[in-house]
Amino acid sequence: EYGVTLDSVSFNDIVISDTATIGSIVNQIPLGTIIFPNGSNTQIPALPSIISNDTINIDASDYFDFMTLHSGYLSVEIINNFPTDISNIDISLINMIDFSIIANFYFPLISSGSSVIDSISIAGLTIPENVVGILNNLDVNQSSGAVGINYDDALITNFTLSNLGFISASAIFPEQEIYVKKEEQIIDLDPI
């Protein structure tokens, strides 16, 4: 009988991305495609709570069913490719098994063309394969003049699990040698 611990297993960072385009947001605004036509140059007014209580399904089933961790980090990075600043971004990540809050993230301001990242420890947590991100709020700030409207410009949100140390897990581990036992064998080759 041999014991092998999960500490001997290496696991690559898990990155799950979500993209929200200007076009998808403009389509939600009454008369949005008329006020902000694709390819136009126009000033964007302040749009408080343009996104609120929007859900993002974070499906990690390609990587694991569940993980109970003794170490690890959860990071959220938001890349703002909109032509104007965004602010008051409030995100909650919810465990869909017991509906507990895994993490809350708040970003007061993300300038146009920049990105921000925040990270928390998830040591001691059990993370299921299905987590829901709730974008509680996102404000679009007024532009400082006319800006180009390109419906393909997007906010990109990357959720990253890194430096994972497992207590237990049901996961798809990368192919690797976890345990090797070498034994010396003595073979008598003398003829009978």
Can you annotate each of these PLM segments?
Residues E1-I192:
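Extracellular/secretory-pathway and virion-surface proteins
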